[in-house]
Regions:
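Charged docking surfaces used in two-component/phosphorelay signaling
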Residues: 186-358
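N-terminal Rossmann-like NAD(P) cofactor-binding subdomain of oxidoreductases
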Residues: 1-204, 235-236, 308, 314-315, ...
């Protein structure tokens, strides 16, 4: 595989830091540019971050002395890289404009942000589930007037446990899904030190999260029609999202109803056999086994299972029949790896393998 020079926009934030750790020894991607807000620009990365390095591993030596660029200087950043990862903390309209500015500068954008998730010609991709949605990129390039530039996004972190678990069961006609998510504090960019309110507490509201959790699966399961991605019409989703005192790892308690109810054995077999393009293409960040089922009654657990396959696999447990829905189960994914930076790196690997950065 060809080597690509990459940049991280929003490099000083928690997800930006996670990108940096994931790209440190990446076999395809060479990190050459870091960009952030005007207040960080011109400083070395070490100076810009200061005491706010939030990863459990040390800051890579390779980035400490790298001078942070101003993310608003699109042409300067774009000239240094083949594409960028974007994880910025700005208003949605500002993010949309910034990402399209990079795309129009012929610099593809792989985004962790939510701003473009429902732009009709922007693919929102989980590589194991809807890799074919990247086929919309030529239509997006036509709209933007670009030869090379485009925006591709990953879906919300809350979905990354339950949508993969449901996906191989769609052949049985999923009609209704009720999901309650229990979401780690790193999803809010926080640690226990910076979020004292969460200690000995559960916060029963995460702004915008329930809408994303109900609506985004329908885009993942949609299809390309002309110059847009048309949303799937089913299943019906309802969600509740809670912030819980866990550092990393989002859990979902899922209740599902089918048009053609499978047996428990058929569900377990579907999970065991499931693989997608990420596995078939042997992408560097892809888990060997995407879905792991635990027979133990007390699994999965964030502390024990979130790092399964380098934090890129989904853990499932407690599958049983339900007296109102057909089945219920619990699932878990690492929200800043599979659910954020890791999922975006995997998407970039898919785009690279399919030639979209050439």
């Amino acid at each position: 595989m060809k080597q690509y020079n990459v940049g991280v926009i929003g490099a000083t934030g928690m997800v930006g830091q996670r990108f940096i750790t994931l790209l440190e020894n990446h076999p395809w991607f060479n990190l050459v540019a870091l960009a952030a807000s005007t207040r960080s620009a011109g400083k070395t990365y070490e100076e810009a971050v200061g005491s706010r390095w939030l990863m459990k591993t040390p800051m890579p030596e390779s980035v400490k002395k790298m001078v942070v660029l101003d993310a608003a200087n699109v042409e300067e950043v774009a000239a240094k890289v083949d594409f960028v990862f974007c994880a910025v903390n700005m208003k949605k309209d500002e993010i949309k404009a910034l990402e399209e500015a990079y795309a129009k500068a012929e610099c593809p954008v792989v985004s962790n942000n939510s701003a473009h998730r429902f732009t009709p010609d922007v693919p929102m991709v989980v590589p194991e589930i809807n890799a074919d949605h990247i086929d919309i990129i030529p239509a997006q390039r036509k709209r933007l007037g670009t030869k090379r530039g485009f925006v591709a996004v990953k879906s919300n972190c809350s979905l990354q446990s339950y949508v993969p678990a449901l996906h191989p069961l769609r052949k049985y006609g999923i009609s209704d899904v009720l999901v309650c998510t229990y979401q780690a504090i790193s999803g809010a960019g926080k640690t226990f030190e910076t979020f004292p309110d969460i200690l000995d507490n559960v916060i029963p509201y995460i702004g915008g999260e329930e809408e994303k959790s109900e609506q985004e699966p329908l885009k993942l399961w949609g299809h390309i029609e002309g110059d847009k991605i048309v949303l799937a019409e089913s299943p019906r989703f309802t969600a509740q999202c809670l912030r819980v005192p866990v550092s990393d790892g989002h859990m979902g308690a899922v209740f599902v109803r089918f048009e053609n109810k499978p047996s428990k054995e058929e569900i377990l077999q579907a999970w065991k056999e499931f693989h997608g393009p990420a596995q078939d293409l042997e992408l560097p960040s892809a888990p060997k086994q995407f879905l792991h089922y635990f027979e133990e009654n007390d699994r999965p657990q964030p502390k024990l299972d979130r790092m399964l396959e380098n934090g890129m696999a989904v853990s499932i447990g407690r599958l049983r029949e339900d007296n109102q829905y057909d089945y219920k189960f619990v699932c878990l994914s690492h929200n800043t790896l599979r659910g954020a930076a890791g999922g975006a790196v995997l998407l970039a690997e898919l785009l690279a393998a399919k030639g979209y950065f050439n």
